[in-house]
Structures are given as structure tokens and as C-alpha cells.
A protein has these predicted regions:
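Intracellular juxtamembrane helix-capping segments at the cytosolic ends
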Residues: 205-218
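Glycine-rich segments within core transmembrane alpha-helices of 12-TM secondary carriers
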Residues: 1-14, 23, 28-29, 231-241
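Helix-to-loop junctions at the C-terminal end of transmembrane segments
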Residues: 152-163, 249
Length: 288
């Protein structure tokens, strides 16, 4: 979707003007929200937690696993041993057990959005300043976006089979190494496309994996709050990235200097993932 939006905009603007991009971008999500409200089933764990209709829960389960329930089937959730019954979602996110993990997740997502938004916003300009023509810069930038879907699928597959923190830390280290390499392969157009694809797979794919990691970490009563705070505080990194990218370019930084500097947040993310893993090691799926 991220990569396809650029191609769609290139088709819309010459025909109906720049306003058409905003009309399309506003109308389609509203239509999709109505479709989702009508057809998308509620989370099973949320329905059970809220003591929803058992008949409704059984219908959803039957869609996933036909024949697995009967009229006598009742669904319950195990007690959350680290959640007090009187605690509100915000209190759970910040209680003694979850506080350290919450701060680490927020820091990781701050750095993640700083990275991907700076690259998404400024990479075409940086490549053009490095001597590439506009068309080549656009294609290399598109390869960065196209790496995300493949990276997300591959990392999801790996996270199901290996320790999630290790997989994600490896993805960010790979993305950081590819960032450094990008600054030194100028003039090799095909190689730059391949390296940009790897960067997108590691960084954009890692962001998708972070959503899964966060959802596994927070208990059900605070899952939406924990994820929401992670995304909200992460957006601060996205905002700062716009100013940081402009400052780097105005200061005359070379492509190699910018990409080497951006590898630092990728390494910090890997370090924070390792710290979170070590802090919660031995707690099973809650640690994920």
C-alpha cells in the first residue's frame, strides 16, 4: 500500500489535479471503516474478557475452526496474575511489572518511526543530491517501501518459530548494516535498489513485528492502551525526523554520513530489544 500510493498519485494528479489524491485518501478509508464495522468480527479474547454473548463467540470460533464447538461450549480466560482487579489500563501499563517493558517499547518505537519516516521523507532528496537522476531516486525509494511487505511476512514466519526479540534485533541490525552500505554504493544503480530493499525489509518489517511484540507483552485489559501509547509516543520520533532530515541536508551532510548516522538508532533498537528480553526472560509468552 505504501509503495502503491506513489504510483496511484502519479496517475491521479495529471488527470484530476493534486486535490484528487486527498479526496481518494479521505473517501476510501471512510468506506473501508463501514465495511469493517459490518463484517469484521470482534477479538475473541476481548469478547470473553467483556463477558460477551457465548453464542456470538461460538459463531466466530466456528468460522475459524468448523465443528470445534457445541451449544454447551463456554469460553473463559486464565486469570492475569500480574494485574490487580481494580487497576485501570494506564495503571497496568505503568505498574511494577510492566513499567520497564513499557518504557523500552516506547523508546524502540520512537527510534523506529524516527528512522522510517526520515528515510521515507528524505531518501529521494538525498539520492538526488548524491547525483542520481529523479527517476532513479524515485525507484530506489520505492524499493525501500517494497521491502516492507516481504520483510513483514518473513519476520512473522521467523517470530513464530524462534525467540521474537532475537529475530527483531537481527532485523534491525541487518537494516542498520544495509544503511551504512547504501552510502558507499553510489553509482551502482542496481545494487542501490537491492540495498534499499533490504533496508525496507529490516526496518519496515521490524515495525510490523514490533506491533506483534507489544500485543503479546501487554495483558488483555491494557493491550489497546499499551499499543496506543507506543504508537502515540513513537509519533514524536516521526515529527522530529522531519526536522532532523532537513538539518542534515542543510548542513551539507553526504549520503554516506547520513546513512551512517541513521544506523545508530537501528543498533540502539537492537540493544533495547536485548535488554527487554533479558529483563523478562523466563516468563514465557508474557515476555514476548
Amino acid at each position: 500500500g505504501a509503495a502503491g500510493g506513489g504510483f496511484l498519485a502519479a496517475w491521479l494528479v495529471p488527470r484530476w489535479g493534486w486535490q484528487s489524491v486527498f479526496v481518494f485518501g479521505g473517501v476510501v478509508p471512510m468506506v473501508l471503516s463501514l465495511v469493517m464495522a459490518a463484517l469484521m468480527p470482534e477479538s475473541l479474547t476481548y469478547l470473553v474478557h467483556r463477558q460477551g454473548s457465548q453464542a456470538r463467540i461460538r459463531r466466530i470460533v466456528e468460522r475459524c475452526a468448523p465443528g470445534s464447538t457445541s451449544e454447551d461450549t463456554v469460553f473463559v480466560l486464565p486469570a492475569q496474575s500480574r494485574v490487580e482487579s481494580h487497576e485501570r489500563p494506564v495503571q497496568i501499563v505503568l505498574n511494577r511489572h510492566y513499567r520497564a517493558g513499557s518504557f523500552m517499547l516506547w523508546s524502540i518505537y520512537f527510534l523506529h518511526l524516527f528512522l522510517v519516516y526520515l528515510l521515507g521523507s528524505w531518501l529521494p532528496t538525498m539520492l538526488k543530491d548524491a547525483g542520481m537522476d529523479l527517476q532513479q531516486a524515485a525507484i530506489v525509494s520505492a524499493m525501500f517501501q517494497l521491502g516492507g511487505p516481504l520483510g513483514s511476512i518473513l519476520l512473522g514466519w521467523l517470530m513464530d518459530r524462534h525467540e521474537a526479540h532475537h529475530v527483531l534485533a537481527g532485523a534491525y541490525l541487518l537494516g542498520g548494516a544495509a544503511l551504512v552500505l547504501l552510502g558507499y554504493v553510489g553509482g551502482h544503480y542496481a545494487l542501490m535498489c537491492a540495498v534499499a530493499f533490504v533496508i525496507g525489509a529490516g526496518l519496515n518489517g521490524g515495525g510490523t513485528g514490533m506491533n506483534a511484540l507489544s500485543s503479546h507483552f501487554f495483558p488483555l485489559p491494557a493491550r489497546a492502551t499499551g499499543n496506543g501509547w507506543m504508537h502515540g509516543l513513537g509519533r514524536i520520533g516521526a515529527v522530529i525526523s522531519a526536522f532532523a532530515g532537513a538539518w542534515m541536508l542543510n548542513a551539507g551532510w553526504s549520503l554516506a554520513a547520513v546513512t551512517a548516522a541513521l544506523a545508530v538508532p537501528a543498533v540502539l533498537i537492537a540493544a533495547l530489544l536485548a535488554m527487554k528480553y533479558l529483563h523478562y526472560r523466563g516468563e514465557g509468552r508474557t515476555a514476548k
